[in-house]
Amino acid sequence: MSFYEIETPLIAKHNVGKALRAMKETIAEDKLPGYIVARYEDVKNDYRLMQDAMMRGLRDDKIDEVYADIMRKVYGAGLDVLIEEKVKKYSSFAYARVSAQQTEAHPDAVRTVLEAYVQDMAMMAFEPESTRKAKMEKLTADHHAYMKQLFNALLVAPMWNDRRAADFADLLLSPTIDRDDALLLVSAVMLATMNVNDPYKWDMLAEVYVRATDKVLKMRALVGWVLSLPYNPRGPRLFPFVQERIKAMLADKTTLKQMLDMQMQMLFCCNADADNEEIQRNIMPTLIKNTNLQMTRLGIVEKEDDPMKDIMDPNAAERDMEEMERKYRKMMDMQKQGSDIYFGGFSKMKTFPFFNDLCNWFAPFNAAHPALGAARERLAGSTFLNNLMENGPFCDSDKYSFALAIAQIMDRMPDNVKEMLNSDATLGPTVSKEEQENPAYICRSYLQSLYRFFRLYRSKRDFLNPFILDELEDNDGNALFMSYKLLACPEMEENAVALCGFLLKRKMMRELMSMAICYKSSQNPRLVRFLALVPMTDGKWQEAYDLFASVPEDQHTEESLRGMAHCCMSLKRFGEAVAIYRRLLAMHPDSFSYQLNLAVCLMSSDAFSSCGDASSCGDASSCGDASSSCGASSCDASSCDAAFSLGGKVEARPNKVVEEGTKLLYKLDYEHPNNANVRRVLAWCMMLQGNFDKAIDIYMRLLSQPDAVSADRLNAAYAHWLSRDVARAVALLREYCNLCEQEEAEAKEAAKKQGRRCEPTKSRNYRLVEDFTKDADLLSKYGISLTERKIMVDIVLNEEEF
């Protein structure tokens, strides 16, 4: 038995009896501490009293409240069981349990120690100069040892109650304790609550966030309560104050803005490996090539200038400097956008003994930290540590790494480099005081420290990792916290819109799908257009259309109309699509993409509404400005893939409508003679009309261009096949399959770098059968039977052995 077998009856069924029976079995199977058994006995006795009262025929008007209170007590006892499971399974929790036995974690006792430390530090000013340094170092070391034990004690602390949560909140907000102590304890409670979801500890973090006036404490508390939110939306029903607290916080616009910034920064952290690869491949080689320092066995020395270089190429130095500045600006731009540019370098510097202690990963940077004693000695007379603390552009974790690393190589540095340590230039671009007080910067810095812990700590698998986008293992979380149902409410919809745009821009379609599932009942037109991208990506056009249609007519935006028109084209509702594009052109008469789409719809309407699947060739919505709004991969009309079949009898076209479409199409070709999308549509229309030679001519010109796409080869193959040049069609189909496989490999590599699951690879057979099925109307119209399609697949695959 386990905690989850105790929790399930409570969360899913609200059944005390089943939960108590599960706990009884757990106690019988496992050797649990006496305090858990005692807690179980107390709850069991309370429940028996309720049963006895009912047996005697007594009625209690507050029976539901009493029953709910007993459920909460059982849940608390279950959390204690979960802690014991972690103590037995994970070394970090086992060590914390041993360490916790030496510390009293009651808030009153903690307050006494923390306030005494502040007072003792203040009294150091009155100590004689000769003894002050030694006494301060001892006081700091003793206090650090206490904080380490307290951190561990909070990690394995049993479930709190409302009184203890309130007392700890008051303590952490008190001006009479050191701020660094408060910051470290917030992290301890966060780590504990993430792994053992105590609603009272969570509420304490939320209370600190709401009441804190210190920006650093406030943002650390924000990260704390967000990352320790319960995944199961049913859980907070046992503790209504959780939902009430969330509702109250989400009513504040500042909180919403800070949550959105935090969510985006978490996704940037998740992309740290890809950013590091970009820096190592395209930026660092240039910066290293142009440095005048080199490492030798004797230390760092300056390289001598090459006298022949100025003679042979007098402009080389200037070009090198310009190139180095350009690469450096690119790296700084990445940082400004949110990229974690320092992770790659500092990830190699987390092997110092300092990082063996769990609490040190969460410690705010302090030059007086006991672990920096050797660094302070070696850097005596240098302002480096103070500059690092006050102006360093790194997160706290990296500041410790930098200080420890510099201290190690100090003796091997040339004198001029040692002198540089006294200037801010050593740290690269420093951070202004104003920027350091920006909540977004504070949050980003803290998240980067956390990311390093969850990626690099030696026992990282002991803890739930909130920086995972896919839940791959038991101890993985979900970095996309805004997809939690607990946060899905009208107040969050504007945040959801902004986040969906962010995800779409980075082609994170799986994460976009998670948001769609969370907000599937929304009628916000700006949000609906993003939610519809998920079924559109899977080719579920009717489902996407229904989402757009759910928006009240008077609330449609340009984006929702554009998406609805795309669905209509794919569903072969060309008449409806024509009406929508006319409406869009009334907004933007000169829009190229709207005119091109209208032309396609006009030439596809009425007599052609009974033809095959419509998708990308006819949809020019991906051309020009519309690409930013549609975005689903299957909606990429720029490829003009042959899945869009305008089939039907040519002579059945309504003359006036087709004439309008033809004129518009030739007008666009005249105005945009080099536009590939116009040429694709023209080629497709030529093929539909049986003008295969003209279609082939256009497709060959398209294939000769560097912006040709894989679907151009598929369409060109169709044109050759329909003109009975089968050999050329086979060659083009093989090229098409090769390109598709190359594109899939690149997409997989990109997904791997971002830590996301990859879509399954399509076999060549599957791909060709899928394409031929989509375009069956076109192929059948010109006499390509199902049998011929099967044979063509075998020819392309070269399957001669049977």
Question: Where do the model's predicted regions map?
Answer:
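"A position-specific structural signal for the A-helix of alpha-solenoid helical repeats
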Residues: 5, 22-25, 38-42, 73, ...
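Alpha-solenoid helical-repeat scaffolds
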Residues: 363-555, 559-566
